[in-house]
UniProtKB/Swiss-Prot annotation:
Residues 1-47, 64-117 are annotated as: Disordered. The keyword Phosphoprotein applies. This is Eukaryotic translation initiation factor 4E-binding protein 1. The modification N-acetylserine is found at S2. The TOS motif mediates interaction with RPTOR, leading to promote phosphorylation by mTORC1 complex. It comes from the Eukaryota. A motif (YXXXXLphi motif) lies at residues 53-59. Belongs to the eIF4E-binding protein family. Phosphorylated on serine and threonine residues in response to insulin, EGF and PDGF. Phosphorylation at Thr-36, Thr-45, Ser-64 and Thr-69, corresponding to the hyperphosphorylated form, is regulated by mTORC1 and abolishes binding to EIF4E.
Amino acid sequence: MSAGSSCSQTPSRAIPTRRVALGDGVQLPPGDYSTTPGGTLFSTTPGGTRIIYDRKFLMECRNSPVAKTPPKDLPAIPGVTSPTSDEPPMQASQSQLPSSPEDKRAGGEESQFEMDI
């Protein structure tokens, strides 16, 4: 590289944008905050770099052989990562299970957790 060479600069151009007017935040569900109407996804890194994933690229990744191959050293979880076993599940007797009237709700509703107040 010679000392007399100069770097050429490309002229700057405006980035094409399209604005979509949303009348209410209800039109954009929380899961769609990082998507565009065309289906492009974007995210940012902790350093502030914006990564843009085109819909076409994501659809190609979905059909790639790598996406259909399970990861190495995946634990065997019956019914999740491996087929369910043919053994019937162990039945616990009623004396082994603690039951309280709070656990049995009308209409099949069960509490997610217990809280002492």
